[in-house]
């Protein structure tokens, strides 16, 4: 009986792997599909616009934040539209880009924040994780982009604080590490002007972020009135906070979603009055390999009831795609230092 149970588990595991490989191949075939001119027929609000129209609202020199984490809740339509506008018109240019979580594809996957890693388009990149953003790292290596790293927790506090007029955060995080300007470089990995976003003050570090002008985030669905729903998204991260910050700073808040639903005030959502633009991308993804039109429940709040199986499936996907960094002893030690 025990042997039979084990064999059944192996069979299920093999079936899972075969299905996941099928998903990988299907995703590879469609991973750069997009319709940047799409408008939903059922829209009522005039806040609905195409991806290209939304990109045209971003001014030169703006500070832009994109929400999301790794391959989850990516703002792909915005990345593509901004890049294509820049390649066609040379605008917007000189952007500062903020990304709390790692949002790159290690130079392998399209539709990540690496799309805007073009010389002159983004001239300063601030993030809590830069290893996956190979295009940004290459620009910094060429001396064309200022690169800054900050702790993710302090970044989210700063973003939330901007909505309340708070411009800095004091913390002991990072003391006596490379983030401490007294013994390291502070936030600056490379900065052409010697600027820094971290300052020492006794037994605390003082962290800062530039004021957010444009907030971009990925929701699941919108209703015809322009409310954006966060059901079935893989990550929410700092979506609410970045929208509130941009609005408080007199800037723009824009969302991309995967489809339309009827209005439902009982569901978690960002209300239409907080948004300046809503873009519908029929190819929008909940996460890598999972279109928003067919969300994977294991990525949704509450999961699918089998967390262990979900974790094993994710590990297998990561081994196949090799998009998630593999951390060695040095990276682990740096992580421990930064989290003291």
What name fits each language-model region?
Residues 2-340:
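Conserved alpha/beta enzyme-core scaffold
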